[in-house]
């Protein structure tokens, strides 16, 4: 049976549909066949301000114009993945799990918003953990306020590793942690005013 989660307030509204993997519907086949087209990298805002140079890399089909001039595209060396060309600023949509043991044997289906197949968040590798006796404080070897802010907001991110964070979850897993953080943060600021459609609640 389909499971639909909704999470909304005055700024953002997320609808997520979860389809079991045993169902062989045409929608599931379309998701599976177009999986390679939906792969995108989503970066945390601090990665955009990281102190790394932006390099000009040539396309495969680019031709050389004159001596030493290439018509190419800009690419940040930090963003390396299957499709590093587009990076949406706000990660909203569904995600494909890396393995079947993520939340049982489930495959995530299409949502009502444009889907994002995988959301990869790279934790900064320039962080060093403080002594175990002190508080949970991260020391920056390179001074960057954005990296420090990111570690304060997301203390559970693994350091120096790539974490694949799915935005959907099944019934045993409960609501995903990122959506829960967004939901509780906005709920604390202002009370939600409006009607809730019970058709979009979890079954």
UniProtKB/Swiss-Prot annotation:
Q: Where in the cell is it found?
A: Cell membrane; Nucleus
Tell me what this protein is called.
Vexin
Q: Which organism is it from?
A: Bos taurus
The record's section on InterPro entries has: Vexin (IPR040470), Vexin_dom (IPR027900)
Q: Give yes or no: UniProt keyword Glycosyltransferase.
A: no
Family designation: Belongs to the vexin family.
Give the gene that encodes this protein. VXN
Lineage of source species: Eukaryota, Metazoa, Chordata, Craniata, Vertebrata
Function according to Swiss-Prot or TrEMBL:
Required for neurogenesis in the neural plate and retina. Strongly cooperates with neural bHLH factors to promote neurogenesis.
- May I ask which residue range the UniProt record assigns to the signal sequence? none
Q: Show the segment(s) annotated as Disordered.
A: 59-101
């Amino acid at each position: 049976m389909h499971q639909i989660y909704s999470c909304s307030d005055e700024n953002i509204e997320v609808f997520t549909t979860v389809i079991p993997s045993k169902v062989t519907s045409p929608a599931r086949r379309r998701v599976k066949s177009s999986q390679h087209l939906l792969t995108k990298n989503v970066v945390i805002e601090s990665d955009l301000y990281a102190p790394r140079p932006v390099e000009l890399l040539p396309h495969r089909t680019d031709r050389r114009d004159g001596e030493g001039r290439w018509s190419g595209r800009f690419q940040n060396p930090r963003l390396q993945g299957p499709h590093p060309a587009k990076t949406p600023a706000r990660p909203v949509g569904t995600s494909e799990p890396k393995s079947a043991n993520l939340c049982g044997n489930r495959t995530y289906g299409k949502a009502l918003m444009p889907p994002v197949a995988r959301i990869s968040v790279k934790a900064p590798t320039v962080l060093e953990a403080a002594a175990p006796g002190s508080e949970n404080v991260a020391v920056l070897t390179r001074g960057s306020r954005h990296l420090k802010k990111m570690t304060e907001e997301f203390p559970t991110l693994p350091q120096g590793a790539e974490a694949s964070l799915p935005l959907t979850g099944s019934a045993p897993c409960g609501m995903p942690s990122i959506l829960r953080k967004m939901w509780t943060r906005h709920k604390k600021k202002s009370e939600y005013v409006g009607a809730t459609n019970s058709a979009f609640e979890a079954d």
